[in-house]
Amino acid sequence: MGEIQNSKNNDKIISSNGIFLFNFINQLGGEAFILPTAKDDIKSLTNILDEANDLDLIISSGGASVGDYDIVQRALEKNNFELLFSRIAMRPGKPLFFGLLEKIPFLGLPGNPVSTGVCSIIFLTKIIQKFFGRQVSENIAMMRVNCSLDKNDHRKDFIRSKVIKDINNDYIVEPFSKQDSSQISLFAKAQGFIIREPHENKIKKGTKVPVLLISENI
């Protein structure tokens, strides 16, 4: 991974997740700290975790799936980690996991920037709301969709979308044509996520669908 300050390194993926999470947490009222980037070995990650034992919440980004270099959970297992849930049937964000590291809540986010963003909005927002004793809530509105949607598969789908007004000045939702989790620019432009339940049937154009609103301008 390449850091944003070293963006001239064209052969590397820019490491944007830490900056996104830092700002996202601060906007929610938390106080975020960016720990050093761990190398792809258990010892390096364990040393960093030792520095985080006075935090209220620890978040990792990347290394949450089961590949050879995904060593986060293996490192945690050596440090008395209690896994509470993992591998969520959702898109994007399947590799997410959550548990307790010596009683400190630990949220493991996927490394893909779009997956990190979607999972932060859905999961991290609620965690921070609970920390502050706020009512856990989501801003969900029913809107007509301006295109048909195919039958969904076994995963809950969060479709990145924009919200526009029709000729009657009513809000309607328009999904982006590209939903690949590599589309960071489209995630940045998203105003909401159409929520599709697992195995949901095909939806006709004009049908009202639940939309998780993420823009303050709607």
Task: Please tell me what each predicted stretch does.
Residues 75-218:
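Flexible glycine/proline-rich
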Residues 7-10, 48, 72-76, 122-123:
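Short, glycine/charged-enriched secondary-structure capping and boundary segments
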Residues 4-6, 69-71, 118, 206:
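Short glycine-/acidic-enriched loop or helix-start segments at secondary-structure transitions
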Residues 10-18, 42-45, 65, 69, ...:
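Generic structural signal for well-ordered, non-membrane alpha-helical segments
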Residues 37-40, 63-64, 88-95:
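Short, ordered loop/turn segments at secondary-structure junctions
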Residues 1-60:
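Phosphate-binding glycine-rich loops and their immediate beta-loop-alpha structural context
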Residues 57-72:
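Glycine-rich beta-strand-to-loop/alpha-helix junction loops that act as flexible
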